[in-house]
Amino acid sequence: MKKISRRNFLLASGVVTVGAALAACGGGSSSSTAASSAPASSAAASAPAAAEGKVLNIWCWNDEFQSRFNDYYPEVKEIAADKSTTTLKDGTTVKWTINANENNNYQNKLDEALLNQDSAADDDKIDIFLIEADYALKYVDSDYVLDVKKDIGLTDSDLAGQYQYTKDIVSVDGSQRGTTWQATPGLFAYRRSIAKDVLGTDDPVEVQTYLSDWDKFNDVAAKAAAKGYKMLSGFDDAYRTFSNNVSAPWVTGTTVTVDENLMKWVDQTKEYTDKGYNNKSSLWDSQWASDQGPTGKVFGFFYSTWGINFTLLGNSLATPTAEGGKEEVGNGIYGDYAVCEGPQPYYWGGTWICGAAGSDNLETIKDVMLKLTCDEAIMKQITMDTQDYTNNEKAMEEIAKSDYKSDFLGGQNHIALFAEAATKIDMSNAGPYDQGLNESFQNAFKDYFTGNVEEDAAKANFETAIKEKYPELTDVVWPA
């Protein structure tokens, strides 16, 4: 597979500055073209060994990996009060650059920095950056990322315990260019008290029998509405479950193909909105968060692994931990959630660690990857402490078969369900345009759901949006 060109790397992020566009077309100086000659990863592999740098620059979009690093990387010595830096035992200073994900902000700033990587001072070069599943291929299929085996030095044996899909999604032509501490299968998290009221049971096995396909799921939505509840919070909640079960990638060549399964999401969401089965919220807005808390009347939420411990738990509390609240039964609806498989297997998100071409900290990067993504004991401890689902099959199977219980989930061992779901994840239809096209598709149809435009107008708005964002994509094909 031919790697993404410098110009298409920029186009895939949806933004091309005038200067960058000129450089991409050959109008820039040689110092500004990070990938103008041989692939950076190849250069890194053939370069003589150099002394390790004393500054490790890590770029990410929130503090999740920062927390994992500071709490579980054995070489951490001290953490600055403002958490802007972490000092390692060998004296290396880890500098954290955190740019929020909203409106492509993280990718835009990361892209600019990577394009200037060659000309940056050694202590300013990016060493590690984090990527998500939705846009992983944009980066790993470029010359800005190091091969974790050939360039960084991990071995097949080091990586053997990880879920295969977590390696496949960051691999191009056999070259693995990232690694992760987490696997992210999805489940359906529901309110126990609401399930009891609507279905007469809160038992996960029994609840699953009512939600095992979309027809049954829709039947429960009607029953929930009759009891005064919403089945889902908003427009976006079920989207991943549909988009992860498409029959082909979004883009082939320069043609965008809208999968039939996405139109099933449109039909269901329109029906739920018209019938009052949702609260018309959008993912991450205040209504959506509130619906997960003590005053919420929503039956459930589609969440993957990180969502349980990183988002849902926090939203369930009446008194946030930042205000002195404790993660315990009695604080809000802590303990009132449970999880089941839901109507279809899916995944949501996941964060991969990438080594940046041009880094002078390859040994440190290797050690970070080894300890935080390959060490079975550390992976198991992260799960035991945080309820996150980590990327080690043996460790997760041990917990799944143990007497482990989540107090937040009313004593349920949710790791057992995640372990079963993780083996069903299929990343074969992932592509570099996924994030932008998924967001544009969801945004275009919100006006249709609320009755502001007809369906044909929503389709036209989607086509306009993606042609503005990705001018190299020339055609859009809709299901017959």
Predicted regions and their residues:
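Conserved N-terminal structural module of periplasmic/extracytoplasmic solute-binding proteins
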Residues: K3-S5, L10-L137, D156, K380, ...
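Periplasmic-binding protein-like
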Residues: R68, R192, L370-E398
